[in-house]
A protein has these predicted regions:
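An N-terminal structural lobe/cap that precedes and organizes the functional/catalytic core
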Residues: 2-112
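RAMP-family (Cas7-like) RNA-binding scaffold and associated basic/acidic loop-rich RNA-contact surfaces
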Residues: 4, 11, 93-287
Length: 287
């Protein structure tokens, strides 16, 4: 697809009629320029999502910079901003929490499971449990063969995917595969290191510090909480005092994608980064 390609309604209708997909591949680079670090999202234990991909017949070490789920959420929030700014019109369902000023509402563009989320399941519409309401029934009765109800009330669920796993039938609820998938991958990724240190201007060390009965601290042994062997002690470092020598953040055990002793949380440098987005047209045709 050339960089000057403009997707019009006529082109989209023609593509949906017979093509397999609309694909976007966009080269990206770090804000600091080539060679500067980027910091992927961390997962259990502080590891990044490392994987090996086949590129031009070669194994290439890659790292996930933004997942399919995360990209979908970003797209949904962009739609929500445009909707609230009046730049587009779109059906939107919201669960409102008037008594909680810091929350106010959660919409189908924000809830993790979209219209199928437990937030809406456990809400009411005009005093009726949501799933027993006109809108709820239209959503529940939607199927791959007839998704008109879902299209009317929550069309974005047909684009970003939905699984009605929170209803009365649990995991047997209707599934709609996502039609739009996007992710950002870093190719030729090399792990960096994360360092930490602290110089205590007070120079606190080798001081007897005790824990008080209310879990505070004191230097008075007589006011300390008594243990089996006398006053219960603690260390200055436990109170965020004393020096922390320069250290590297390394894995203390083998993790899913990182071996013991390998760097954690240190960012990565890349040969290149790329956004790949695919709109499945067969997926749209099924609807």
């Amino acid at each position: 697809m050339s960089t000057d390609f403009i997707l019009t309604l006529d082109r989209l209708q023609a593509a949906v009629a017979g093509a397999a997909a609309i694909r976007l591949r966009q080269a990206l680079e770090p804000a600091g320029g080539p060679g500067s670090k980027v910091f992927p999202p961390t997962h259990e234990g502080g590891q990044y999502a490392w994987e090996t991909r086949r590129v031009d017949g070669q194994d290439v070490r890659c790292v996930l910079l933004d997942s399919v789920q995360s990209q979908a959420n970003r797209c949904e929030l962009a739609l929500l901003d445009a909707l609230r700014d009046g730049r587009l019109r779109l059906p939107l369902i919201e669960a409102r929490f008037a008594e909680f000023s810091d929350l106010r509402s959660v919409s189908t563009l924000e809830a993790p499971h979209r219209i199928a989320d437990a937030i809406f399941r456990d809400s009411t519409l005009d005093g009726v449990p949501f799933r027993d309401s006109v809108i709820g029934k239209a959503f529940i009765e939607s199927t791959i063969r007839d998704a008109n109800g879902l299209f009317r009330w929550c069309p974005t669920a047909l684009v970003f995917g939905m699984w009605d796993s929170t209803g009365s039938v649990g995991g047997l609820g209707t599934k709609f595969a996502r039609a739009l998938s996007a992710e950002i991958i870093g190719y030729g990724a090399q792990a960096g290191v994360h360092t930490s240190s602290r110089i205590d201007p007070l120079g606190i060390k080798n001081i007897e510090i005790y824990v008080t009965p209310d879990e505070d601290w004191t230097t008075d042994a007589g006011a300390a909480k008594q243990g089996k062997s006398g006053p219960e002690k603690t260390k200055p470092s436990a109170l965020n005092h004393s020096n922390i020598p320069p250290t590297l953040d390394l894995a203390e055990e083998n993790l899913a994608t990182v071996k013991k002793g390998e760097p954690l949380r240190g960012g990565v440098t890349l040969d290149r980064a790329e956004l790949c987005a695919v709109l499945s047209l067969p997926g749209l045709r099924k609807l």
